[in-house]
Design a protein with these regions (language model features):
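Generic start-of-chain signal for non-secretory N-termini
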Residues: 1-20, 27
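Long, highly charged, low-complexity intrinsically disordered interaction regions
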Residues: 4, 56, 62-80, 90, ...
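Short flexible coil/turn linkers enriched for glycine and charged/polar residues
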Residues: 15-16, 28-29, 95-96, 121, ...
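Short, ordered loop/turn segments at secondary-structure junctions
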Residues: 38-40, 129, 239, 321, ...
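Duplex nucleic acid-engaging cores and interfaces of nucleic-acid transaction enzymes
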Residues: 50-53, 60-318, 322-423, 430
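Structured, non-catalytic alpha/beta "coupling" segments that mediate domain-domain communication
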Residues: 74, 88, 99-102, 226-239, ...
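A glycine-rich phosphate-binding loop feature that marks nucleotide/adenosyl-phosphate handling sites
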Residues: 182-189, 319-323, 377-382, 402-409, ...
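Single-stranded RNA-binding regions, centering on S1/OB-family and related RNA-binding modules
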Residues: 543-717
Length: 717
């Protein structure tokens, strides 16, 4: 039997040794970001996505192994565990297969077969099921089991009881269930019909049928939701005449007098027990698969949103639009510190709009505002139009519509109250919106990832699994970018490898009590932050103020000695690194030979390459290499759009059936999957990601329904 490491190696296409190394590192308490970044020699430079797949599958396979042992122990307790059964359980590849094998031995609720066994009909059932050549006719065999005292009045009663027992035995057969399950998933169809006459968003599924292998995940989730709301009736279909022959071949022995009786028992087993059970299993399996796909897509969309390039170092105004409570305003400096707040009422009438423009213009001039961030919620359209009007008298100032999802939840929460105790709840959301433009990652980590709103059906998914996946993405992003130890919030620090909520708060408390950290080593003085946590977190924390230039790089303290040897070998020093005067470092290393240099300084080649990159760009932010966000000074209206126009926009969301693109008209346009590119793709994420800047062609505009149809593939280069 293959070991867990061998199974994972085969699934991931990795050497067994690498997989064993990763398992050992995980078991020692190392995090995925730490393993991905600082243990490349041990796993061949697998990326964080592959490592998380490995971790997820490792957990599943360990749970599977645990369940195997539990099942064997339970069957052994009944004195029924044979070598063959134990071997079958050990080689079961899924929890469903283990469940099938355990099914005959599992304690059941009272069934028709249970009642028949209590009437003493088990021997009759076994006699008929054996289908020996000399087996008497069922009616004759049943005569011996007539017993009015037990409720078996006639031979027909005895045969009915025997049928019930045989049907349950057939239904509990692991091989039969596996074969029919496979047939259902290959040849079955999902059908949904209207359960009501009223119109709804589920009208597409009022008379819908599709082969199971071709079902898209978003359709499964939509149908599930429609069924839950009582608007759809859903069934799984399988051609009975295709299933029964397979069942008969597994059970019926030709030439026996009991053959026709057993055929009838097969049909009863299929109709009454097997099919309803497999239908439930199929629905569950389809839902699980759709959920995993949706969670994966949510995670895929979340990553580029978190890694949006920051617009740092500029005074920024945040506008949280609204009707009843007005438009909340906050001005922050280049570091995110609040300079001013107010509320204006541009939607109350023309006079109030003029007053709002005058007030905001004065604030912009007073503080030297460079950019304005506008939340995309209620009254965003009117606020954007007011801003554009205002910018005509403010040359050099630009604006951007910012996704405000989760801002209201954050502003009313404990975290915002601790951060801004002196500001009203409504003003806190304006501060958050401004900061989202300045540094999206630092601000978005304060919000539950589910609330960021870049997924489908996230409220229908298993929340624990969704949380795990999304928190993993946030963790990967935070550690990929790196965190300034002396300015980061506890929310941001909490996602750093090796840290948790408690140690993150302890770092902030230590910083407030003792002043800025002079270097990374000082972390070891933080309460509850021991050597293991330091090992895991140190490389991801930056200290720009440190005397040691390496403290402001992604070089891990364990590699400081190697980095210093490398600099000496290449005739460079700390000051050269600080001044950015080591551009030719990689060329020098390649000229000397990477393998030779790596051996000389005592690290592997992957670590050497990472050290060189960090020395060449100390304090670098990987987000600066990504396309800058589109800052606008003017606005389009839907009525301005005409088919054939080519516009530049930002991808806001990627889902199964297409891509939503912000083209600056407040209403995102849809690029249907068929219009994403000329080649066939299974999913739009094969081509684009959230945050991508794309050119689109306007295909159609429906002002009444607020729909804009776009194409990417029809844009002429």
């Amino acid at each position: 039997m293959q070991s867990i490491a061998q199974i994972l190696a085969s699934e991931l296409g990795q050497p067994v040794q690498y997989v064993e190394n990763v398992i050992a590192l995980l078991d020692e308490g190392s995090t995925i970001p730490f393993i991905a970044r600082y243990r490349k020699e041990q796993h061949g430079s697998m990326d964080d996505t592959t490592l998380r797949k490995l971790e997820d599958r490792l957990q599943y396979l360990r749970n599977l192994d645990k369940r195997r042992q539990e099942v064997k122990s339970a069957i052994e307790g009944q004195g029924k565990l044979t070598e063959a059964l134990a071997a079958a359980i050990d080689s079961a590849a899924t929890l469903a297969e283990v469940g099938d094998l355990y099914r005959p031995y599992k304690q059941k609720r009272r069934t028709r077969a249970t009642v028949a066994r209590e009437k003493g009909l088990e021997p009759l059932a076994q006699l008929l099921l054996a289908q020996e050549k000399d087996c008497p006719a069922p009616e004759a065999a049943a005569q011996a089991y007539i017993d009015p005292e037990k409720g078996v009045e006639t031979a027909a009663d005895a045969l009915q009881g025997a049928n019930d027992i045989i049907a349950e035995i057939i239904s509990d057969d692991a091989d039969i269930r596996k074969a029919l399950r496979g047939l259902l998933m290959r040849q079955g169809r999902l059908r949904s019909l209207a359960a009501t006459e009223e119109d709804s968003v589920y009208r597409l599924y009022y008379d819908f049928e599709q082969a199971i292998p071709k079902l898209a995940g978003h359709k499964i989730l939509a149908i599930n939701r429609g069924e839950k709301e009582g608007l759809l009736s859903v069934t799984v279909l399988l051609d009975r005449e295709a299933a029964l022959p397979a069942l008969r071949r597994a059970v019926v022995k030709p030439g026996s007098a009991a053959m026709e009786f057993i055929k009838a028992a097969c049909e009863d087993a299929y109709d009454r027990l097997i099919y309803p059970s497999l239908e439930r299993e199929a629905r569950s399996a389809l839902t699980d698969s759709a959920n995993e796909g949706a969670i994966g897509q949510f995670a895929l969309n979340l990553k580029p949103l978190l890694l949006q390039p920051p617009v740092k170092g500029h005074v920024t105004m945040g506008l949280d639009p609204g009707y009843a409570h007005g438009c909340k305003v906050a001005v922050i400096d280049g570091t995110g510190k609040v300079l001013d707040t107010t509320v204006v009422y541009p939607t109350y009438g023309e006079r109030q709009k003029r007053e709002a423009i005058a007030k905001l213009t004065a604030l912009c001039k007073k503080h030297g505002v460079a950019h304005i961030a506008i939340g995309n919620g209620t009254a965003s359209r009117e606020t954007e139009q007011m801003t554009v009007e205002m910018l005509r008298s403010l040359p050099g100032v630009s604006y951007m519509i910012v996704n405000e999802a989760g801002a209201s939840v954050y502003s009313a929460g404990k975290l915002a109250a601790e951060e801004f105790p002196d500001y009203d709840v409504n003003l806190r959301s304006a501060i958050s919106i401004a900061r989202r433009l300045q540094d999206p990652l630092a601000e978005l980590v304060k919000i539950d990832p589910k609330a960021i709103g870049v997924g489908q059906y996230q409220h229908d998914m298993p929340q624990k699994r969704l949380d795990e996946a999304l928190c993993g993405v946030v963790e990967d992003c935070v550690n990929a970018v790196g965190v300034d130890l002396n300015t980061a919030s506890a929310s941001l620090l909490g996602y750093v490898s090796g840290l948790n909520g408690t140690t993150a708060k302890n770092i902030v408390a230590y910083r407030e009590a003792n002043g800025a950290f002079p270097d990374r080593k000082r972390l070891l003085k933080v309460p509850k932050l021991g050597p293991k946590a330091y090992e895991q977190c140190a490389g991801f924390l930056r200290v720009p103020e440190s005397k040691n230039v390496l403290d402001n790089t992604g070089v891990h303290p364990e590699s400081y000695g190697a980095a210093e040897k490398l600099l000496a070998l290449c005739g460079c020093g700390d000051e050269d690194v600080r001044r950015g005067a080591v551009d030719g470092l990689m060329r020098k290393v390649q000229a000397m030979g990477e393998a030779k240099v790596a051996e000389e300084i005592g690290v592997g080649v992957p670590t050497l390459r990472d050290v060189v990159k960090e020395l060449m760009k100390p304090g670098r932010d990987l987000r600066s290499d990504l396309p800058a966000p589109i800052l606008r000074t003017d606005v389009l209206d839907m009525k301005d759009l005409k088919p054939g126009m080519v516009l530049t926009g930002t991808v806001r969301n990627v889902i199964d059936f297409g891509v939503f693109v912000d083209i600056g008209v407040h209403q995102d346009g849809l690029v249907h999957i068929s219009q994403v590119c000329s080649r066939f793709i299974k999913h739009p994420s094969e081509v684009v990601a959230v945050g991508d800047i794309v050119k689109v062609l306007v295909l159609d505009v429906d002002e009444k329904k607020h729909r804009i149809s776009l194409s990417m593939k029809q844009v002429k280069e």
